[in-house]
Amino acid sequence: VSVNHALKHAASSIGKKITIDWIDSENINGNVDTLSKYNGILVPGGFGTRGSEGIIKTANFAREKNIPYLGICFGFQLAAVSFARNVCNHSDANSTEIESNTNNPIIDLLPEQDGVTDMGGSLRLGANDINVKPDTVANKIYGQNTISKRHRHRYEFNTKYLDEFAGKGMIFSGESDSGRRMEILEIPEHKFFVGVQFPPEFN
């Protein structure tokens, strides 16, 4: 509901009307071409294995067809997995939330979560500062070099793959204040391909 309201308010602010279709990602696997009629794709937060392959295919379709894409939280994570599979040629790339034995854990547990079994009490929660790199789409959107965003997640991008991703055309334009965690991804050569680890909401 909040995503619907945000999109409608954004459209209204620029004098546009918007039509929103909710699509079950479980139904995407063999029908990804049905997305070609859309002017933009937004993948909101989520978790688990259900529909994950459909999301990965959706992110790849948006990238290949130059369709604007915004991935939020899980949509950020699986956009990175999709890029690893289809651009970096790591065919088994995945999130360890989905496949714990993958040889290419693009998304992995936060270091402090390793061995934690109390899922509800182990999330990374609350507001955290994010440094936004200059001359990026993210910086143009926020208009500042530091932002504060709320978080709610246990998994994050594996920085082992940072240089490889950059060499293939995906950069991380926002990172935690410590520089340890990647918060915003984008493809500079794409019309608009952005993912954010945090929910982009008011504090």
Language model feature labels by segment:
Residues V1-T146, H151-E189, Q197-N203:
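N-terminal beta1-alpha1 cap of cysteine-dependent amidohydrolase-like domains
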